[in-house]
């Protein structure tokens, strides 16, 4: 936890251009862009408002920690375990990969049957090394990308 706080402080200080101990909306936008995110102006305003617990229009370091670290501390560990469980539920034969047939079966079981076109598009998008199956790493990447898209932020390609 201390390492995470130290890393977060380094990042915060790097983007606190005037070294006043707080991030302006422009400094927050620069920090987000450095992480590969492309939030719109409205999204940055909403994010700043949600982080700005003292209502002064800036994000202080403790507000950043209060927003980010609870998630890093508990949620990330829980989510990686949950992600592995989801992956295993798709990987019916337990070989460490999700085949097209396993993906189709799992989606149908969840009440979301796929057309052949949808299935091939999903495999193509997730299968970054082109071996025809989805590894856990590829599965985790596509799930992370989906989460980023869900929150309305875009990753630089």
From Swiss-Prot:
**Superkingdom per UniProt:** Eukaryota
So where does Ca(2+) 1 get bound? 16, 18, 20, 22, 27
Protein's UniProt keywords contain Methyltransferase: no
Q: Where is the secretion signal located?
A: none
UniProt binding sites for Ca(2+) 2: 52, 54, 56, 63
Question: Record's Gene3D superfamilies?
Answer: EF-hand
| Molecular function in Gene Ontology | calcium ion binding
Q: Which InterPro entries match?
A: CALM/Myosin/TropC-like (IPR050230), EF-hand-dom_pair (IPR011992), EF_Hand_1_Ca_BS (IPR018247), EF_hand_dom (IPR002048)
Binding locations of Ca(2+) 3: 91, 93, 95, 102
Chain positions recorded as Ca(2+) 4 binding sites: 127, 129, 131, 138
- Which Pfam families does the annotation name? EF-hand_7
The alphabetized UniProt keywords are: Calcium, Metal-binding, Repeat
What are the EF-hand domain coordinates in residue numbering? 3-38, 39-74, 78-113, 114-149
The UniProt function text for this chain reads: Potential calcium sensor.
- Return the protein name: Probable calcium-binding protein CML15
Q: What species was this sequence derived from? A: Arabidopsis thaliana (Mouse-ear cress)
């Amino acid at each position: 936890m201390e390492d995470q706080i130290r890393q977060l402080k380094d990042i915060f200080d790097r983007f606190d251009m005037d070294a006043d101990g707080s991030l302006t909306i422009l400094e927050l936008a620069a920090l987000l862009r450095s992480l590969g995110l492309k939030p719109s102006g409205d999204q940055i305003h909403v994010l700043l408002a949600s982080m700005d617990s003292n209502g002064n229009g800036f994000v202080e370091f403790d507000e950043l920690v209060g927003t980010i670290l609870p998630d890093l501390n508990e949620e990330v560990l829980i989510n990686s375990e949950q992600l592995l469980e989801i992956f295993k539920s798709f990987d019916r034969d337990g070989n460490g990969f999700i085949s097209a047939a396993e993906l189709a079966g799992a989606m149908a079981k969840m009440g979301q049957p796929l057309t052949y076109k949808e299935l091939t598009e999903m495999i193509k998008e997730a299968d970054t090394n082109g071996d025809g199956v989805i590894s856990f790493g590829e599965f985790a990447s596509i799930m992370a990308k989906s989460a980023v898209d869900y929150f309305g932020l875009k990753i630089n390609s």
